[in-house]
Amino acid sequence: SLLKLLDRHNYYDTETILETAYPDTGRKLLWLQSEMDVVSDGSDGDRLAAMPDKILKSSFYQPSTSYRWKKRTDKPNPLLNPWQQRLASYKKTLEKAPAAEKTALRRKIDHAERVIEELKRYSFLISEYDPFIVVPLGVVNQSSPFSPQFGDYAVVIVGDKLYPALVGDAGPRYKTGEGSLRLSREINPKAGPYSRPVSDLKVSYLIFPGSAEPEAGPPDYEKLTDRCRELLNEIGGMGKGFKLHQWEDLLAP
């Protein structure tokens, strides 16, 4: 029964998954109709050198997103030092750990080493600052021409508002409808890591497969708006009374 499910709310979180193409232009579109949960992950030392203690000390905050690009400065990622400290703690604990706990600790050490290497080499989207969506693993990076790739452009529609966004990460196969904290709070100022902006299946995610820029990089907010407007025009344009949101770059120098 539903009462036995871990999360009854997400038992039914998808109204539509539609693959279509506009006949006049051939522009492919993946349309997801769902709710919106909040994802709060990501970091980028090049654009944001410091993060709050609640993030630095969090055991749950994920420092990376699937959409990433090579670091462009020598500024360290703010989460690098906490992860290095975590790795040192795991190694110290391993020295005196009973045999039954060593396997799990070695897995934690391996994971921490991979994260540290990523933080040294790459930058990522930041949920609090960048508007992006999360697509289920079973949908993204598949062989279908309608399957989105990381960095593809998307437009999120809630009511009469249209929000430009990027496909920034992949989530569980069983979960549809996730947006970054920046996107969520623009839709509903009361949204937070534990409070979704939209609970009903009234959010349209228009994803444009194959639209990602040739070279990954930090979001260019002017280009984000312009490109999403172009893509919307390729599927017939916006209806009367609808407006495309213009994001402000909160991390601009």
Predicted features by range, described:
Residues 242-253:
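Short, solvent-exposed mixed-charge patches
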